[in-house]
Amino acid sequence: MSAFLGEEYRDLQAVAAKFKDAYKNAEPFPSIYFDNVFDEEKLNEILAEFPDLSKKDTTNYADDVQVKFGSKGERFFGEKTKAFMHYLNSEPFLNFLQELTGIEETLVNDPYFHGAGQHEIKPGGFLKIHMDFNKHKTLGLDRRINVLVYLNKDWDESYGGHFELWKTDMSECGAKILPLFNRMAIFSTTDKSYHGHPDPLQCPEGMSRKSLALYYYSNGRPADEFAHSKEDHRTLWAQRPDAENDTFTNKKSTVTKVINRLKKLGK
């Protein structure tokens, strides 16, 4: 039992057993979210350590598909954040994810936090709908699970920033999750799991959308999780129907080919 966990979640294996069917059967793809998973006082301490990533030597994404900031490894983690992230990479939490998701291959954490860690989106920022890169560039493992822990207090729905999960054929959004403080979202990462935060953030100046992201991997994956080929690919972007501001220039052509192949396969 971890001191990071809230009272209702002290027995993670029981939580996983209770919700694994809901996870498996979720639409538009396997996913779930939990509220108040973590001890509020400890999460407050982690929020207090969260830096303004725009003022650090971070990864600054600013193009037609994303406007956001991301940390690089552990370098900007405070001591409490580091302990928390290490817990989310620990055996007990991996066992929880294994049971919840039903993944048969052994899940492996990412000590490098490649593409993960602290994420921040300022007013006007966004992350267009996409499927994730499917291989870890250092470990060579298959990406299987994303975990997102939101740190946004007093977040009004009018601010936007919903985490959107889209159908594989990009015909419509299947689910939306508001990024509220102490909410944890979990979803399976495949070539069919399109997701993002596609519309510009509307929160007031001085606020931002903050989250902690962790990705989990395995050595191999089921063949039915490949939509187009078994080759490694980077993040692939998808255009929403009737969304005039989803213009991806050369990046759009890559994912359009993927979508067309999916439609031909009837997936």
Predicted features by range, described:
Residues 11, 20-101:
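Non-heme Fe(II)/2-oxoglutarate
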Residues 48-51, 76, 85-143, 152-154:
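Non-heme Fe(II) oxygenase catalytic core, chiefly the N-lobe of the double-stranded beta-helix
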Residues 12, 39, 43, 81, ...:
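A structural signal for well-ordered alpha-helical scaffolds and beta->alpha junctions
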Residues 67-71, 100-108, 119, 123-126, ...:
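A structural signal for the main folded, soluble domain(s) of proteins
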Residues 136-143, 153-267:
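Catalytic core of Fe(II)/2-oxoglutarate
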Residues 146-148:
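Eukaryotic charged/polar low-complexity linker/IDR segments
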Residues 1-16, 20:
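N- or domain-start disorder-to-order transition segments that initiate the globular core
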